[in-house]
C-alpha cells in the first residue's frame, strides 16, 4: 500500500536549509519515492498555520519509505534540514488499490 510523508516546514536559516535542498534529489533518486509537492507558498484555506513550506513525497510501501528515510545518505543531509528548519512530518497510508483490496477480500 502506498504511503505519503507530509512535511510542514518553518525555514529559519535559508542558507543551511538550502544545503539540504541542493543535495536532496541526488539522494532521493536512488530510492523508490516520488516528490509530489514542494510548495514554498502554500495557501491556508482553513485554520491557522505559520509554516512557509509543504513537501509531500510518496513511496510504494512503508518499507521503501524507511529504506530512504533511515539510509545513511539521507541521515547525513537531514542534519542541514533539522538545523535550518523546524518540521512536523507525518507518514500516512494511501487508500488501497483495487488489486490490494481484491487480495485481502
Per-segment meaning from a language model:
Residues 1-54, 60-70, 93-105:
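Short S/T/G/P-rich N-terminal loop/turn motif that feeds into the first structured element of a domain
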Residues 53-55, 87-88:
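Generic beta-strand structural signal
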Residues 66, 74-92:
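C-terminal structural segments of small proteins and small subunits
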Amino acid at each position: 500500500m502506498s504511503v505519503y510523508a507530509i512535511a510542514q516546514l518553518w525555514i529559519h536559516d535559508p542558507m543551511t536549509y538550502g544545503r539540504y535542498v541542493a543535495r536532496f534529489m541526488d539522494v532521493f533518486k536512488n530510492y523508490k519515492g516520488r516528490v509530489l509537492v514542494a510548495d514554498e507558498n502554500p495557501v491556508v484555506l482553513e485554520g491557522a498555520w505559520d509554516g512557509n513550506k509543504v513537501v509531500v513525497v510518496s513511496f510504494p510501501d512503508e518499507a521503501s519509505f524507511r529504506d530512504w528515510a533511515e539510509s545513511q545518505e539521507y541521515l547525513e543531509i537531514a542534519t542541514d534540514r533539522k538545523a535550518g528548519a523546524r518540521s512536523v512530518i507525518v507518514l500516512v497510508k494511501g487508500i488501497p488499490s483495487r488489486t490490494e483490496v481484491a487480495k485481502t477480500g
